[in-house]
């Protein structure tokens, strides 16, 4: 049995959510992800680095806000400074040249993907909101502590609260991976990937999208990936010519 080639993922920008209607007329909530100049900025090889991976960068960043080290790194790759940089482990036969730009047709409709992002931070939250605790009773001796989490330990032995006890604390703003998200549609001209359901992170945040590790890769998925080589211009959007209006017919007898 030959395992499928482990391809690179992409760095996408979360634009927001909308909905579409399927053939049965049911509305499908989707999240719109944009490929904001996702380019290969580095290649890791076994001979040089001990492992095989691709370093990708996405988003525009001003040169004055980029460190000298990263500015030189991007200049060596002949790409503009990137806002976000991330690595994706790939197989040796899935390496892509530096400077290539990943396109939306890297994924196909119906494919399962895993999406990793940083959840929306909600600040300090109580146990009921953070851990879905039921709280204390509304009456019968309970005063002020209706939303408290209750006991935090045992007795004199062990005489302490165990690490990891679910208590009030900071909620959100943590790295989360959503598995087996379905790709609803891809728009190559606009560089958009539409996936069913919600994606971790707020609007404008960057997420990492890769092939699902627990599902088989579709046979029509491009290998090693869909990309434009360095210096290759993006295809222009097809323009539909305007239809000419039919000329008005003049009836006989009219001047």
From Swiss-Prot:
Keywords: Methylation, Ribonucleoprotein, Ribosomal protein, RNA-binding, rRNA-binding. PROSITE patterns: RIBOSOMAL_L3. Residues 232-248 have a biased composition (Low complexity). Methylated by PrmB. It holds the Pfam family Ribosomal_L3. The keyword Glycosyltransferase does not apply. One of its GO terms (cellular component) is cytosolic large ribosomal subunit. GO terms for molecular function: rRNA binding; structural constituent of ribosome. It comes from the Bacteria. Residues 218-255 are annotated as: Disordered. The keyword Cell membrane does not apply. The modification N5-methylglutamine is found at residue 156. GO terms for biological process: translation. Part of the 50S ribosomal subunit. Forms a cluster with proteins L14 and L19. One of the primary rRNA binding proteins, it binds directly near the 3'-end of the 23S rRNA, where it nucleates assembly of the 50S subunit. Belongs to the universal ribosomal protein uL3 family. This is Large ribosomal subunit protein uL3. The gene is rplC.
């Amino acid at each position: 049995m030959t395992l499928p080639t482990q391809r690179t993922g992409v760095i996408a920008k979360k634009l927001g959510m909308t909905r579409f209607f399927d053939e049965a007329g049911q509305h499908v909530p989707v999240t719109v992800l944009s490929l904001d100049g996702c380019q290969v900025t580095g290649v890791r090889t076994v001979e040089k680095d001990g492992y095989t991976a691709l370093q990708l960068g996405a988003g525009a960043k001003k040169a004055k806000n980029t460190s000298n080290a990263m500015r030189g790194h991007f200049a060596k790759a002949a790409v503009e400074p990137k806002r976000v940089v991330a690595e994706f482990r790939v197989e040796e036969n899935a390496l892509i040249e530096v400077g290539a730009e990943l396109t939306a047709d890297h994924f196909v409709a119906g494919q399962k993907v895993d999406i990793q992002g940083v959840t929306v931070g909600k600040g300090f939250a109580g146990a009921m909101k953070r851990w879905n605790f039921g709280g204390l009773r509304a009456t019968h001796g309970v005063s002020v502590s209706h939303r408290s989490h209750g006991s935090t330990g045992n007795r004199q032995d062990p005489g302490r609260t165990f690490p990891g006890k679910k208590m009030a604390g900071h909620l959100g703003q943590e790295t989360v991976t959503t598995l087996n998200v379905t790709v609803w549609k891809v728009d190559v001209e606009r560089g958009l990937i539409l996936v069913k359901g919600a994606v971790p992170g707020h609007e404008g945040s960057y997420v990492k999208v890769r092939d699902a590790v627990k599902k088989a890769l579709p046979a029509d998925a491009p290998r090693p990936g869909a990309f434009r080589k360095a210096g290759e211009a993006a295809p222009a959007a097809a323009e539909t010519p305007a239809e000419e209006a039919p000329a008005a017919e003049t009836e006989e007898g009219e001047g």
